[in-house]
Amino acid sequence: MSEPRKILVTSALPYANGSIHLGHMLEYIQTDMWVRFQKHRGNQCIYVCADDAHGSAIMLRAEKEGITPEQLIANVQAEHSADFAEFLVDFDNFHSTHSDENRELSSQIYLRLKEAGHIATRSITQYFDPEKKMFLADRFIKGTCPKCGTEDQYGDNCEKCGATYAPTDLKNPKSAISGATPVLKDSQHFFFKLPDFQQMLQTWTRSGTLQDAVANKIAEWLDAGLQQWDISRDAPYFGFEIPGEPGKYFYVWLDAPIGYMASFKNLCDRTPELDFDAFWAKDSTAELYHFIGKDIVNFHALFWPAMLEGSGYRKPTGIAVHGYLTVNGQKMSKSRGTFIKARTYLDHLSPEYLRYYYASKLGRGVDDLDLNLEDFVQKVNSDLVGKVVNIASRCAGFIHKGNAGVLVAENAAPELTDAFLAAAPSIADAYEARDFARAMREIMGLADRANAWIADKAPWSLNKQEGKQAEVQAICATGVNLFRQLVIFLKPVLPLLAADAEAFLNVAPLTWNDHATLLSNHQLNEFKPLMTRIDPVKVQAMTDASKEDLVASQTDTGESAPAGNGELAKDPISAEIEFDAFAAVDLRVALIVKAEAVEGADKLLRLTLDLGGEQRNVFSGIKSAYPDPSKLDGRLTMMIANLKPRKMKFGISEGMVMAAGPGGEEIYLLSPDSGAKPGQRIK
């Protein structure tokens, strides 16, 4: 038997400036399931994380609330810890970047980089908020991306195209703090010489450490040439002062990833059998994995490995990147009640419902994951209650009534139990590859076979026949053993269900290797319902409560609707028109037959629209909001049907579809209510 693997795993650090929401939880649940699988298999797998507790945002929020930054991050850490615990995210240590360990390691790594010649110093022209009397951190400047032209982007990187840049490259900058137009002032800054590591990064990023799609994106940045990275910020700033440089602080993205190391060191200092160097030394044979979202790939796949290489530490074994979460096919929305905080979800629903749904959707790629609330209810109720738990509930009563709760030794379906045994390696491979969706499909396929076999044997009918009781006991004992196998396979995803099943089965905590055996002549405990169906009313209550969270947050922050800063304030209602002018516009329901990108056009999609007997070709500037045009296929929308055709570079546009929003990614194509038909007039 091979030696247990030594694995250290991290998730991205949640920022200590707000609540955890379901988009965040996607990553922590994904990581937790993988860690639990490794532990389930007998490997030494350590999962550490921390709150990302530095930066201007925290300093400014604390100032606004009249408390110290230290008090703020302590309050937020308590909230985060409670949310994670109730979602069954089982960290071995959850620390803070505002810690002695992180200060020590950040200073050490910086000084090692400096001694090796990887730190440069020069004066830069930096934005300064004339109203707040402070230099502006990158995330407190907003404007237009200099690379792709997307509006409302932060001063350090573009969430649309992934480009990184200096804040001074941003077009039309505004202070996100005061709204003032910032002025430029000179300041002495410190830079990490990232280009020193170009060759190493080209090799490392193609060594299997990244998914192919991520490696391809990184290659684009590498091919464009790396730039020195500004790692300093000016006072006032909440963070660690750079050694020997009064008034200069480490940029939060320097000490944040070092927080992984600091959290592990904090754990090592309290755990004698753990050796920090065994996991972080240059020659470490332990495995190191970071789970992150695709929005922070550049920091983890470029800056972080270069910092580690330059300071004499080991680099990650792999970086697992996931996509964003959408809800009902769209970005999470506070007004629609789909921007759901972790706490709001927990107030209404079991964490295991969401854990299973995420698992059923998470592949090993970087595609976005959609939480469709109707599908969520149907899938959980069908798979977990209707398939898995149903097996135990079908069989347990007969065993308790007919054999005092004792499983007989006879295996009534050896071919089926052998099939379950044979499926284990494939399921394990799917877990290992982080292809949770495939693992869940294979497990539910087994559950379908078990239910079909029990239905075919119909112990409820046999039990009414004279002399069939022994056969009933054999069938039900086999059914309970099949249920036990499913629980073993699902335990990394559903630890609460597994614990309740272990209590019913009257067994010690199940491990992966237990799948190779069957229970026989074994006493069961009383069967109690293991999981209840999701009530759609509770889902609706959750979304309603999320809308209430929005109202509460507006009240807490002194916001009001819509006079001060709502949509009408941004885009006032146009001048009145006569009814006849409006009546001249012919609005129709249209079916999007096909949506496709237009070669050579950055913003346009070509829409083929069906008006109920007539097709139209329409060009629409909505590509930024719908990067995957195929998702629009088959959708109903609204169009101006009598707009004079317009000749464009790419063809003739025969109308205009209707959408809301300020532009860029925030465009929302309008749709009629269900039941509307293509070609119907909109009145």
Swiss-Prot record:
GO terms for molecular function: ATP binding; metal ion binding; methionine-tRNA ligase activity; tRNA binding. A motif ('KMSKS' region) lies at residues 331-335. ATP binds at residue 334. GO terms for biological process: methionyl-tRNA aminoacylation. Its main location: cytoplasm. PROSITE patterns: AA_TRNA_LIGASE_I (PS00178), TRBD (PS50886). Is required not only for elongation of protein synthesis but also for the initiation of all mRNA translation through initiator tRNA(fMet) aminoacylation. This is Methionine--tRNA ligase. It comes from Pseudomonas fluorescens (strain SBW25). The lineage of its organism: Bacteria, Pseudomonadati, Pseudomonadota, Gammaproteobacteria, Pseudomonadales.
